[in-house]
């Protein structure tokens, strides 16, 4: 067909459409019948003809009352015909159905036509909710998920995702020890499995810069080194840790990533997606594999009014959801909390009120990584003409890095050093410090116990603890509160509304994530078993089949493919102990010995034996710690001495002439004697010298 024929056909179509509109307004029934007949003919014609693309050289449609400008058409580029208008004119539009039963007496035919519309919309809705058909369901590929930390506990997050030839490690975090692990400051995951698969690990993938996600990185790099991918703040804080550990040379492994820019890491294609949390520059991960797409939310909340005005990238999450997601791994920390988590910006009015009413110094303690929280309180300090002293190594370091990288902007002239605080009136000072978890070496703890070199708590101080105690730290936080209250300071803690908000999604935000991603399979992560179990119920309420959900524990290995999810094994997992003051790992046996000493005490014996007489010498010494008081010490010593003398008299020459056998023989006797008396097994230090 020539261009002119196209042009004329289009003009006739427009004239026909114009006439049909006039006839409809006139109410001519004959014309309506012809229109209905023409609609059916066009529908039949369209059904028989294959769809085709509109040629790019078609002329632009003109108004039917305008005369064609043949000279202009001859010398200007031809434009695409308005096919949408032609479809409307031909009474045939995709997604729209004409009502044919217009003049029937009843409503049977009319309702049948409406019901077809209901069925069509239901089909669209079902396809929208279940986009898994877009996945390659015939793929035989699969991935294996192995959590090494972060399940069955709060913190210590680390996970391996692997194929037969490639693997990535998501995060490397630390956790706090429970009470009773004496001399242990932090716990880190056991890296044994990483040593087993080290040859196929393509990189470490960091979601955000909280300690429970990056705290183990320097300890890992002391054993194994891999490319480390993260956003600028994450790498900045990890780099600072590496400096403290003497690992500066390993910065060469750092890879700065950009959000919304997928990159290849081994056999995986990974995209960092911006999400809101209680630290700047947090990310979810979209991980494309041959088996299908995996979304890992990291720690998240859905904050529509964050301090930096950078909300969660819901559009990008929905993009992957529409394409079809095989597996979702989502944060379960706040799964028991109904509703939504308040925005970080909602704490501003509470801070304003507290500053307005404060008569003396304001001392605020929070997590050093919560830079937006620190930023907000400093802004109010500036508003109320207070000088700001930032005290605590991690707080100073994190704030300096955030300022240097341009995440926050604060006037340098507003800041003073700790030794300058006494130079200013109390009502002109704001102290921002560490210690919200009751850490005994923190600045707040030392202020409360008069151990800080420059600052002690005063009766007129207002102390704001803008944090919630991490499970396991409740007793430590309570101890600090007691010290502060004894000093007659006013303390703003949990009973004050809106001075702390969580960084984790509550149930309604978890539901929104599930609805956006629409995963085929679901693995709730981050939390104790009760947290992931509650998250499972939320997922079921959002349409994820129960059979498609698995509740993992550290060490479980779960294999996932387009058509299945199953547990395939268990590997060795656990914790390594760290003395954070020396940055050194502590052997498990040492921790066990400390537990033994703390629970049952110590008995020490230095024994001198005359082999020929089979008797104890008077130079033998005995002492105990944590078993009896000083008054009973001599009585206990006499009991043990008497028993040993009888033991030696009954010992044969083989034992007496073998130093090792004699020492073991003596140790076992003391152990049994002490258990019989105290029903405990104290730690026994025993040295035997036979002459």
Name each region found by the language model.
Residues 242, 539, 674:
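Conserved hydrophobic residues forming the short capping helix/wall of the S-adenosyl-L-methionine
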Residues 267, 282-284, 602-604, 684-686:
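Broad gene-expression machinery/nucleic-acid interaction feature
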Residues 655-663, 667-691:
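C-terminal tails and terminal domains of large nucleic-acid-associated
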Residues 1-119, 123:
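Intrinsically disordered, low-complexity RNA-associated tracts
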Residues 145-147, 254-256, 327-329, 463, ...:
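Conserved beta-strand scaffold positions in the cores of enzyme catalytic domains, especially
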Residues 146, 162, 271, 432-433, ...:
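Residues in well-ordered beta-strands of folded domains
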Residues 100-205, 210-424, 442-456, 475-477:
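His/Asp/Glu-rich metal-coordinating catalytic cores
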Residues 336-466, 470-656, 663-664, 668:
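Hard-cation-handling environments
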């Amino acid at each position: 067909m020539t261009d002119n024929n196209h042009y004329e056909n289009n003009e006739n179509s427009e004239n026909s459409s114009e006439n049909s509109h006039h006839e409809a307004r006139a109410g001519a029934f004959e014309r309506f019948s012809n229109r209905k007949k023409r609609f059916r003919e066009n529908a039949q014609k369209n059904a028989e003809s294959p769809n085709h693309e509109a040629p790019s050289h078609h002329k632009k449609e003109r108004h039917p009352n305008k005369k064609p400008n043949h000279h202009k058409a001859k010398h200007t580029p031809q434009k695409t015909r308005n096919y949408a208008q032609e479809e409307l004119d031909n009474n045939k539009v995709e997604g729209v159905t004409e009502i044919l039963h217009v003049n029937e007496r009843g409503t049977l035919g009319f309702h049948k036509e409406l019901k077809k519309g209901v069925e069509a919309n239901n089909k669209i809705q079902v396809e929208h909710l279940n986009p898994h058909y877009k996945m390659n369901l015939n793929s035989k590929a699969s991935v294996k998920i192995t959590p090494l930390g972060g399940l069955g506990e709060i913190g210590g997050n680390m996970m391996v995702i692997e194929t037969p030839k490639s693997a990535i490690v998501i995060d490397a975090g630390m956790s706090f020890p429970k009470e009773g692990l004496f001399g242990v400051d932090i716990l880190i995951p056991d890296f044994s499995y990483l040593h087993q698969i080290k040859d196929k690990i393509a990189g470490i993938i960091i979601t955000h810069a909280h300690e429970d996600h990056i705290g183990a990185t320097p300890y890992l790099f002391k054993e194994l080194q891999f490319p480390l991918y993260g956003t600028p703040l994450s790498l900045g804080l990890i780099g600072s840790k590496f400096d403290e550990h003497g690992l500066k040379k390993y910065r060469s492994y750092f890879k700065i990533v950009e959000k919304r820019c997928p990159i290849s890491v081994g056999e995986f294609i990974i995209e960092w997606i911006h999400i809101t949390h209680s630290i700047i520059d947090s990310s979810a991960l979209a991980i494309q594999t041959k088996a299908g797409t995996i979304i890992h939310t990291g720690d998240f909340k859905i904050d529509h009014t964050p301090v930096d005005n950078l909300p969660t990238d819901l559009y990008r999450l929905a993009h992957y959801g529409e394409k079809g997601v095989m597996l979702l791994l989502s944060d379960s920390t706040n799964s028991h909390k109904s509703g939504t988590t308040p925005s970080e910006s909602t704490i501003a009015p509470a801070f304003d009120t507290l500053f307005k009413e404060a008569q003396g110094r304001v001392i605020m303690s929070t997590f050093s990584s919560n830079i937006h929280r620190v930023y907000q309180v400093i802004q109010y300090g500036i508003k109320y003409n207070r000088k700001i002293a930032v005290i605590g190594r991690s707080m100073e370091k994190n704030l300096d890095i955030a300022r240097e990288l341009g995440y926050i902007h604060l006037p340098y002239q507003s800041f003073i050093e700790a030794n300058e605080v006494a130079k200013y009136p109390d009502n002109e000072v704001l102290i921002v410090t560490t210690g919200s978890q009751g850490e005994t070496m923190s600045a707040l703890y030392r202020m409360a116990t008069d151990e800080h070199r420059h600052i002690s708590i005063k009766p007129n101080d207002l102390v704001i603890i803008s944090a919630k105690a991490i499970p396991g730290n409740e007793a430590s936080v309570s101890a600090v509160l007691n010290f502060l209250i004894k000093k007659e300071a006013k303390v703003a803690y949990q009973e004050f509304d809106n001075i702390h908000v969580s960084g984790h999604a509550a149930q309604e935000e978890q539901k929104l994530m599930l609805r956006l991603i629409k995963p085929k399979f679901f693995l709730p992560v981050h939390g104790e078993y009760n947290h992931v179990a509650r998250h499972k119920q939320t997922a079921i309420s959002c349409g994820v089949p129960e059979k498609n959900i698995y509740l993992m524990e550290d060490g479980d290995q779960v294999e996932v493919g387009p058509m299945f999810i199953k547990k395939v094994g268990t590997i060795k997992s656990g914790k390594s102990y760290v003395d954070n003051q020396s940055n050194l790992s502590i052997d498990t046996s040492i921790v066990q010995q400390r537990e033994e000493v703390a629970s049952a005490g110590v008995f020490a014996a230095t024994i001198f034996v005359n082999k020929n007489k089979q008797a104890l010498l008077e130079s033998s010494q005995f002492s105990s710690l944590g078993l009896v008081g000083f008054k009973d010490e001599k009585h206990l010593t006499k009991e043990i001495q008497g028993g040993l003398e009888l033991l030696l008299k009954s010992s044969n020459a083989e034992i007496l002439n073998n130093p090792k056998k004699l020492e073991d023989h003596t140790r076992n006797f003391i152990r049994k004697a002490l258990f019989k008396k105290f029903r405990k097994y104290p730690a026994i230090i025993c040295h035997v010298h036979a002459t």
